[in-house]
Amino acid sequence: MPSLLLINGPNLNLLGTREPHLYGATTLRDVEEMSRVQANNYGIDLETFQSNHEGHIIDRIHSARGHIDVIIINPGALTHTSVGLRDALVGVSIPFIEVHITNVHAREPFRHHSYLSDKASAILVGLGTYGYEAAIQHAAKNMIRKN
């Protein structure tokens, strides 16, 4: 069965309560459940992972090698700071989709640069939590080979 890995980075465990005027009321658990149902509808296995620690995220990316077809990642603040995360994603040679709930380009200037975007297969910003749905749909229809 094809497989996706959904990774959420720092502070995304606070979805639903952290700055709801920016991120909405949907919790991370809601996002993961919705994503699992949607992936299942496409016949895709979905694994989820969230950490506030860069090294743990890098370790999880490394462990995906050989059994994950596509990574969907909302790297949170690591987007703008982590060369290590970029190197991990490039190093495992697994295509990935970068997702951001808010439009990072309409926010503070330090959020405008991503260390990942030039290596991502697709980038979804500013769609709210619908961005996760769109990423799964794109992966299912355009990135995963059906056997």
UniProtKB/Swiss-Prot annotation:
Its EC number is 4.2.1.10. The keyword Hydrolase does not apply. Pathway: Aromatic compound metabolism; 3,4-dihydroxybenzoate biosynthesis; 3,4-dihydroxybenzoate from 3-dehydroquinate: step 1/2. The keyword Lyase applies. The active site is at Y23, H100. It is an enzyme of class 4 (lyase). It comes from the Eukaryota. One of its GO terms (molecular function) is 3-dehydroquinate dehydratase activity. The record marks R18 as: Transition state stabilizer. It catalyses: 3-dehydroquinate = 3-dehydroshikimate + H2O. GO terms for biological process: 3,4-dihydroxybenzoate biosynthetic process; quinate catabolic process. Substrate binds at N74, H80, D87, I101, T102, R111. PROSITE patterns: DEHYDROQUINASE_II. Keywords: Lyase, Quinate metabolism. Homododecamer. Adopts a ring-like structure, composed of an arrangement of two hexameric rings stacked on top of one another. Belongs to the type-II 3-dehydroquinase family. This is Catabolic 3-dehydroquinase 2. The gene is qutE2.
